[in-house]
Amino acid sequence: MLTDGVLLPELLFGYLNKCCLLPQLFDTAINTSVGVTSPNESRAFNAADDLIGDGSVERAGLHRATSVPGESPEGLQRGHSPEPNDSPPWQRGSAQASQSGYRPSDPLTTTRQSNPAPGANVR
């Protein structure tokens, strides 16, 4: 079917091509997705890049754990070796006696009389 000398499918594709920019969107999505580019290309994924690929991970610096998560280096020096199913340090308790100054309460100095006071109404 001809519409002013142009086939209808070609007219429709031309409209979508100009208005929606479909080929550019597909090219952009394919070229910038992770894992599609090869290491020789300039947009290849780098370990210093985050998912955006702008190098923000490199600018922020690399942070790695130096010990077992949840265990301080002091805990390892005390002789406690972390076990796979071990509880966190704050739930284990102290390895040394606490120096908080805990003192038992003073004994009561006054004693209670067992007999009622004279003149009390006893029923």
UniProtKB/Swiss-Prot annotation:
Domain of life, source organism: Bacteria
UniProt-recorded name of the protein: Uncharacterized protein ML2630
Compositional bias ranges of the Polar residues kind: 93-116
Family the entry assigns: To M.tuberculosis Rv0007 and M.leprae ML0007.
Segments for region (Disordered): 56-123
